[in-house]
Amino acid sequence: MDEFDRRLLNRLQHGLPLEPHPYALLAAELDCREEDILRRLDDLLDDGTLTRFGPLFDIEPLGGAFTLAAMSVPEARFEEIAALLAGWPQVAHNYRREHALNMWLVVACDSPAEVAETLARLERESGLAVLDLPKEATYHVGLHFPL
């Protein structure tokens, strides 16, 4: 990662302007061409520096629902369960934790009922218990990771 990548990622953490040509405005801010930004984003996604780049939507006002869930997955089955979840569009992401509950995942669906159905399906197909940890409150902390 070079200095331009750092400047780009630091700036992107504060969002894109909501306008017809956001990358053109960003290019003017960063003193580069729009194509440079798009190419760098592709490169950062390709090399794994970024795992995702896209909008975040507050799905609840639109009728959607999400939850955080956790599982205790035997090490011998961890990759199997991760691969199972990778094919489910309802699973936004899953990740390993060094804890008895070693797999955590975010489930996002069109409705609370679909969240419950997805977690029940996961229990059926994996044979493992799933701990549902729904959001109790929303906090906006302005998280930023300076690079």
From Swiss-Prot:
MF terms in GO: lyase activity
The enzyme's E.C. designation: 4.1.1.111
Keywords recorded for this protein, A-Z: Lyase
Phenotype reported upon loss of the gene: The nirDLGH mutant lacks dissimilatory nitrite reductase (NIR) activity. The NIR activity is restored by adding purified heme d1.
Domain of life, source organism: Bacteria
Pathway: Porphyrin-containing compound metabolism
GO biological-process terms attached to the record: heme biosynthetic process
Presence of keyword Repeat: no
Enzyme class name: lyase
Catalytic activity of the protein: siroheme + 2 H(+) = 12,18-didecarboxysiroheme + 2 CO2
Role noted for this protein: Involved in heme d1 biosynthesis. Catalyzes the decarboxylation of siroheme into didecarboxysiroheme.
Family indicated by similarity: Belongs to the Ahb/Nir family.
Subunit structure: Probably forms a complex composed of NirD, NirL, NirG and NirH. All proteins are required for the total conversion of siroheme to didecarboxysiroheme.
Descriptive protein name: Siroheme decarboxylase NirG subunit
